[in-house]
Amino acid sequence: MTVLMSPDELEAALRAVGAARYHNRHPFHQLLHGGKLDKRQVQAWALNRYCYQAAIPIKDATLIARTDDSELRRIWRQRLVDHDGTQPGEGGIVRWLALAEGLGLDRDMVISERRALPATRFAVRAYVDFVRDRSLLEAVASSLTEMFSPTIISERVSGMLANYDFITRETLAYFNARLDQAPRDADFALDYVKRHARTPEQQQAAIAALTFKCDVLWAQLDALHHAYVSPGLIPPGAFGHDGIWS
C-alpha cells in the first residue's frame, strides 16, 4: 500500500526523478557539451530542438484553457509571453531561431519542421497530448523538469563556448533569459503540486508525470544519437539524409 508523503517528502521524490532521469545524463548531451560533435551534428540538435521549443506555448495554452482557476491562469500565461513575446520579434522562439540561424540553418526550413526527425515530432506531440488529456495536476507536474534546467543550461553554455569556434555568446542568447525564467516557473509549479497532490494516488501520478516528461526529453536525444552519432541511420526526408544538409 502506498503511503501518503509529506510535501517535503514528495518534493524529494520528484527531485530524485530528475537526478536519475533528466537528459543532462544522456550521452548525446555529454558529447554536445564536451565538444565532441561536428557542426552538422550540432545543427541537427538545434533543428530538432526547435520542434520542442515551438510546442511549449501550445502546451501552455492548452493547460490554461483547461483550468477554471484564475490565479493559475494569470501566473501560467507569463510562460506564453516568455516564449511568444508580446509583439513580433520577441520571445524565446525567436531567440531559438536566432540560434539556429547562427549555426547556419535556414530559418524557413527550421520553422517548417519538415527536416526534423520523425521521432522528435512524435515525442513532442505526445507531450502536448499528455497535457491536454491527463489531469491538471499531472499537466502541471510534467513541467517540473524546469527544476533541473539551470544546471544543464550552465553546462551547455560553458561547454559549447569553450569547445566550438562556430558558436558565440550571441548565438546562445536564448539561454540567458531561461536562467531566470525556469526557476521562477519551477518554484510555482512545485508549490502547486505539493499543495494539490493530497492523496497517495495523486502523489504517485505527479511523480509519474515528471517521469514521463523526462522520457520525452530523453527520447528526443535517443533519436538524435541514433541518426547522427551511432549507428548513423538518418530517416528519409530528415536533415542530412542522402547527404543533403539543408
From Swiss-Prot:
Keyword Oxidoreductase: yes
Keywords, comma-separated and alphabetical: Oxidoreductase, PQQ biosynthesis
InterPro entries: Haem_Oase-like_multi-hlx, PqqC, PqqC-like, Thiaminase-2/PQQC
TM ranges: none
Record keyword Oxidoreductase present: yes
Protein name: Pyrroloquinoline-quinone synthase
Record field: catalytic activity: 6-(2-amino-2-carboxyethyl)-7,8-dioxo-1,2,3,4,7,8-hexahydroquinoline-2,4-dicarboxylate + 3 O2 = pyrroloquinoline quinone + 2 H2O2 + 2 H2O + H(+)
Matching HAMAP family: PQQ_syn_PqqC
Job of this protein: Ring cyclization and eight-electron oxidation of 3a-(2-amino-2-carboxyethyl)-4,5-dioxo-4,5,6,7,8,9-hexahydroquinoline-7,9-dicarboxylic-acid to PQQ.
